[in-house]
Structures are given as C-alpha cells and as structure tokens.
Amino acid sequence: MRFSLTWGLGGMAATLVLLLMGSGILLKFVYEPTPVAAYDSVQTLIAGTPYGKMIRNLHYWCAHLVVAVMFLHMLRVFCTGAFLRPRRINWVVGLGMLVVVLGANFTGYLLPWDQLAYWAVTVSTGMLEYVPFIGAYLRETILSDGELGPRTLQLFYALHTAVLPVVLMALMAYHFWRIRKAKGLVVPRSPDSPVQENPDRAPVVPDLLLREAVTALVLIAVVLLLATLVDIPIGEPGNPGLSPNPTRAPWYFAGLQELLLHFHPVVAVFAIPLFVGFGLLAIPYLKYEADTGGIWFASRKGRKTAGAAAVTAIVATPLLILADTWFAGAGSPPGGLAPAFANGWLPTLVVLLAIGGYTTVIKIAFHATKNETVQSVFILLAISYAILTITGVWFRGEGMVLTLPW
C-alpha cells in the first residue's frame, strides 16, 4: 500500500485527538474554570506542577496541528474523489468532525484567561452580531453583561472538556465504521484505468495497521519534541479595559476576520460561511459524468485545471486585497456610491463575477467536465482562504493595517 494514497493524514488526526484528550484530562487536575483563578491556575501548572509545562505545550501543539491536519485530510479526500458513492455520508461526517474540532479549539482558546485569549475570543464573539435573527441572542447567551465573564468561561469549559469531546468521539467511531462499510479506503488508479468491481485490497492487519502505527509514532515523537523545546508563553491577565493593538481572532478564524475588512459584515460572517457550508455538503450529491474515485485530481486534464486554480488564487487574491485596501483608503467612493455599498457589497459583487468568469474560462479553455470544474473552483477558494489567513496572521499590524511582518 502506497503511503501517498492517504499520506497518513486520517491516522495522524486520530492520533492527535487521542493525545489531546489524554493531555486535557491531566490539565483538568490543576485548572480552575473561574475568571478569578483561571490565570493563576495556569501559572501554577507552568511553574509549580511537575511536567505541567510540557503537558500544556503538548496540548497546545496538538490542538493547532489537528486543525491543519484535518484540513489537509479533507483536501486529500476531495482531490482523490474519495467523497463519491459509497463514501458520500462519510464526507458529511468528516465535515462535522472538522466543525467540532474548530469549536473545541475555539472554546479552549479562552481558558488561560490571558490578554491574547480574552481579546481573541472577544473579537470572535463580536462577529455574532452580524448573524441575522439569532446573532444577538447567541452573543447575549455567551457573554456576561456584554463582556466575557464567569458565565462565558464556565460555558466554554463545559463545552471544551465534556460536550465537544463526546460528540467528536461519536463522530470518529461512526466515521471509521463507514470506512469499513465502504470496504476500506478508495483504491488508487490511473486516469486511464477502469473502475474495478472487485479490486485487490491490502489487508488491514498487518499492512494498514503497521503503516499507521509507524506514522503515529513519528508524529508523537515530533509533537513531544515541540512540547519539550518550544514553550508556549502566557501573557498578562485578561483585562477588559485594555485591548491590544491589533486585536486578532485565533489563527484558524483569521481568514474570516480578514474577510470582514473587505466585505459587508453580514456577507463575511453569515452569507459566505453559509454558502460555503452548503456547497461542501452538496459536493458528493452532484451528478458527475464519471466515477473518478482513486484518481488524483479526477483526470490528467483535472490536474491542469487544478494547477490553473492554484496559480489564479496565488496571484489574484493578494491583488484583490491590495486593490480593495487602496479603494477603501482613497477617500469618498467614486460616482456618489454609498460607503456601505462601495466598501461592502461592491467587493462581493466583484468576487462573484470573478468566480463566475473563472468558471466560464475553465469550461471553455480546458473543456472541463463538471467534476473538473467543481474541483478547480474548490481549490481556488481553498487556496484563497489560506492566503487570507496568512494575510490576517502575518501581514496585519496596528489598526489592522497592511504591513510587512519583518
């Protein structure tokens, strides 16, 4: 069995989840989930608990790595056509697990109760105001009198340590069962190979088990090395009266925060995530011309359209960010346009037209099939969001102004 079939990403994600739960249980022995004691309990964990600092470092690195690994796993599944029948439900389950992992990371981000955590969560919960109908109610439910307080911390602690882990473990068990029901992993094949009714499969024991065990051991060694050599600092205690500049959301929401700078808030916080979410759920249920399961990028032509999508995203996304930044800072909008339209809805219209134009060009220039077109647009949006995240994390300075990181 070739390692390049899956790159071990699913096994790595499962390993990181188990490490997170094990280290999280140990952290619970010291942590106190109250605004008065939370920060001091983390300080005690770092300075006064044997191996406490290393366990906290381990938990931190696993939490951030699992988000990246699960995102890469989703890309691998998509690019090898492993979301088609009979694996359609498992694609939906995988998306659910990614959402739960993001929720677990977000709820855990607040628990140290330092300045970075306090204001990152403040910014993120502030985005809820722009969700129509239920946004204000959700924000009031989470916050205590309009700001983070005891109720917020207790809610996040309960979700982080009890509710979300149980949901994640249930989804993982169902995910693995669905893989078995689908008769294992998707069988790799070349673009010219026909679909085999009864392909030769490698046994789980010892082939798959041995490969995944080796991958897990290497990953554990890397994470332990990071936990030993790279300490995770803790800042000053959270202060509601003193916000840092810039105030950033956690890195996995930095792309969403970047969107807020370029689109109308309702579009950035509600419409785009809703559209992308429904699009991801619908992907396996679209009617495609052929079964491309096991073929990287669907076909040889699909590899070209995927490359075109990557190049387009890498070139166009930074240019659009720069253009919108210049346009927003140029003063009053031209043509008497309302500022809310010029700085919010107009970029939305431009992006929609650009995506529509790109889709048309791909179909005409490459004679792309539906599968190749969907794949190309998916890669275009995924890389664009990655660039938005990089911009939000490293290229935003004081006042969220574009700046160089060095």
Where are the model-predicted features located?
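Long, charge-rich C-terminal accessory regions
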Residues: 335-339
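Periplasmic/ER-lumenal interhelical loops and adjacent helix-loop junctions
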Residues: 136-140, 253-262, 266-267
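Charged, compositionally biased interaction regions
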Residues: 340-345
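Membrane-embedded alpha-helical bundles that constitute the cytochrome b-like, heme-associated redox core
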Residues: 1-251, 271-273, 277-292, 296, ...
